[in-house]
Amino acid sequence: MSDNVGLNTPRGSGTSGYVQRNLAHIKPRDYGAPYPKDLDSLRHKQRQPDKGILEHDRKREVEVKVFDLRDKLEEEEVDEDEIDKRCDELRQKLLAEMNLGRRGGGPKKSFKQHQVHEMADAKIKESERLRKALKISADYEEGGHWKRQEERLRSALEKEDNDEEERGKVSPPRD
């Protein structure tokens, strides 16, 4: 045994005491790599929902309702052609309502943890309502006031420097 590695003594351990390197261990390459270094990238960015997933979930809800109708009609022993006809009518009606934007039940307040795209979509809509309620312009940039104030101060300093240069050119220095 060397350099305090391994067992002090292999007696009673059921091993030979031979120390091996763990070849499955992967050493991290860059310790700070996933974290950005500039402050602008640390600001919160609104997570954008995937429109395809949201559309798929809405269509899935429609198909669940159609399947419930089909199951109910099959229990009532309705003719297969009639079942297909009614299911198609319901599907067309629900898809038309979905396309018009009319969703039953109003805005959904509670989401399950796996519904991240629905939560992101609801958060964007909530932020938009809040922005309109507070009459904030759509092109508002956070910290824009400070940037404008800094720009005004910078232009005032430049103007003052230019005025001093003008005064220096007009009146020659006296001996």
UniProtKB/Swiss-Prot annotation:
Residues 54-97 form the CWF21 domain. Belongs to the CWC21 family. Gene3D superfamilies: 6.10.140.420. PANTHER family: SERINE/ARGININE REPETITIVE MATRIX 2 (PTHR36562), SERINE_ARGININE REPETITIVE MATRIX 2 (PTHR36562:SF5). Keywords: Coiled coil, Cytoplasm, mRNA processing, mRNA splicing, Nucleus, Spliceosome. GO terms for biological process: mRNA processing; RNA splicing. Residues 57-94 form a coiled coil. It is found in: Cytoplasm; Nucleus. Involved in pre-mRNA splicing. May function at or prior to the first catalytic step of splicing at the catalytic center of the spliceosome. May do so by stabilizing the catalytic center or the position of the RNA substrate. It comes from the Eukaryota. It holds the Pfam family cwf21. Associates with the NTC complex (or PRP19-associated complex). The NTC complex associates with the spliceosome after the release of the U1 and U4 snRNAs and forms the CWC spliceosome subcomplex reminiscent of a late-stage spliceosome. InterPro entries: CWC21, mRNA_splic_Cwf21_dom. Residues 105-114 have a biased composition (Basic residues). Residues 25-55, 98-126, 144-175 are annotated as: Disordered. GO terms for cellular component: cytoplasm; spliceosomal complex. The gene is CWC21. CDD domains: cwf21_CWC21-like (cd21372). Residues 37-55, 115-126, 144-159, 166-175 have a biased composition (Basic and acidic residues). This is Pre-mRNA-splicing factor CWC21. The keyword Transferase does not apply.
